[in-house]
């Protein structure tokens, strides 16, 4: 049974509305002032409120405004009872959050019809809210599943750690690292176009495919061949128009050679040196279109020698494409300078980097997924 709250300082109108609505099968409670009406609403939120516009103390407009500003009460259907019928007055009421109006003197059939319509809309709002909560629960479960797929930080023989912050509950970034043999480790990070579930599913597919080495007859030690195989497998025409950028590298700890290839991805940054003023910065990137854009795309390998005590950062563009408080976009070069400045001053660089980016971001949430892999070489 729907509960209706009637707020009116006129006792006769209270009783008239109460009797009429109870005959329609509704449960009706009453209040004589705006303050009392708000307290009753907070104590037991009704499905619909009929409130007089002009009352001593809080007016109907003020009551409506306060109730509608409470997120828990925003779906309560609010009808203003008024003798005012000018356009300006109605605009004022609508701006305060009123859903409908009933003009005095009250016409019984009109009132009953407006109440029925208001309760239908309230029920629809409640149903949508229930579906929203269900969807949020399912998305939270999916998020936990995605997090369970990500690798754990490792300490030996390489120190690998990461920060992962999706822009929504589900993100399009994904990464992994796994040993191909006792001396060679594959490390990669990909960024699927878009956000949310449609971006997450292709990322999970790539992760599972590479982790299980399901692409037969593929040389996983050769990054360019891996990217070419992924490009053949994940053409966007068959993937809901989703493409992705990726950086893929293989490090051999005996030869200290890092072989890598990229597909439209930001360069990975290798830092070597002993101080901020004595740091060699290598931008590790090869030419190549994002995976899935063109069937004939070609990819090439590059390699570098890894100096002792070097640090490699692999990241998505969400790590530096951040809108600052002045409306300008932060830059890759600024991000690299932060990496350099923290390289020798603190041990847990990733925590400091993430906190810096959170403070830098001018919006409540990041506009893009943010992933940073850190590999410290001995």
At which residue positions do the language-model features occur?
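… and, occasionally, acidic/histidine-rich disordered N-termini of signaling adaptors
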Residues: 129-312, 364-378
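Acidic catalytic/metal-coordinating carboxylates
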Residues: 2, 32-36, 47, 59-65
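The feature encodes the CheY-like receiver
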Residues: 14, 56-57, 65, 74, ...
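Active-site-proximal, acidic helix/loop segment immediately C-terminal to a metal-coordinating Asp/Glu
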Residues: 197-220, 306-364
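Receiver (REC) domain active-site loop signature in two-component systems and cognate sites
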Residues: 55, 67, 93
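Charged docking surfaces used in two-component/phosphorelay signaling
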Residues: 15-23
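Active-site beta3 strand of CheY-like receiver
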Residues: 44-50
């Amino acid at each position: 049974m729907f509960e209706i709250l009637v707020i009116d300082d006129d006792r006769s109108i209270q009783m008239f509305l109460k009797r009429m609505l109870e005959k329609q099968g509704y449960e009706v409670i009453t209040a004589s002032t705006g303050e009392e009406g708000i307290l009753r609403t907070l104590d037991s939120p009704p499905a619909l409120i009929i409130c007089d516009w002009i009352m001593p103390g809080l007016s109907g407009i003020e009551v409506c405004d306060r109730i509608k500003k409470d997120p828990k009460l925003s779906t309560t259907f609010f009808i203003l009872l008024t003798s005012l019928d000018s356009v300006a007055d109605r605009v004022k009421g609508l701006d305060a959050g009123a859903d409908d109006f009933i003009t005095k003197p009250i016409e019984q059939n009109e009132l009953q019809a407006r109440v029925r319509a208001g309760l239908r809309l309230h029920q629809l709002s409640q149903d949508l809210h229930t579906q929203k909560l269900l969807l949020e629960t399912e998305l939270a479960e999916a998020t936990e599943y995605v997090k369970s797929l990500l690798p754990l930080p490792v300490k030996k023989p390489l120190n690998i750690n990461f920060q992962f912050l999706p822009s929504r509950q589900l993100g399009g970034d994904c990464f992994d690292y796994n040993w191909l043999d006792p001396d060679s480790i594959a490390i990669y990070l990909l960024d699927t176009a878009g956000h949310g579930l449609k971006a997450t599913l292709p990322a999970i597919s790539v992760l599972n495919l590479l982790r299980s080495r399901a692409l037969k007859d593929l040389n996983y030690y050769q990054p360019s061949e891996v990217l070419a195989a992924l490009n053949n497998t994940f053409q966007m025409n068959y993937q809901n128009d989703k493409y992705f950028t990726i950086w893929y590298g293989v490090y051999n700890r005996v030869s200290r050679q890092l072989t890598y290839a990229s597909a439209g991805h930001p360069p990975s940054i290798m830092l070597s040196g002993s101080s901020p003023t004595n740091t060699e910065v290598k931008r590790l990137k090869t030419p190549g279109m994002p995976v899935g854009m063109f069937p004939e795309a070609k990819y090439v390998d590059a390699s570098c020698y890894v100096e002792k005590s070097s640090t490699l950062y692999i990241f998505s563009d969400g790590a530096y494409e951040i809108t600052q408080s002045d409306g300008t976009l932060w830059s890759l070069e600024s991000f690299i300078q932060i990496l350099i400045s923290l390289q020798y001053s603190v041990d847990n660089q990733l925590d400091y980097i993430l906190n810096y980016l959170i403070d830098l971001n001018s919006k409540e949430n990041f506009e893009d997924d943010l992933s940073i892999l850190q590999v410290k070489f001995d």
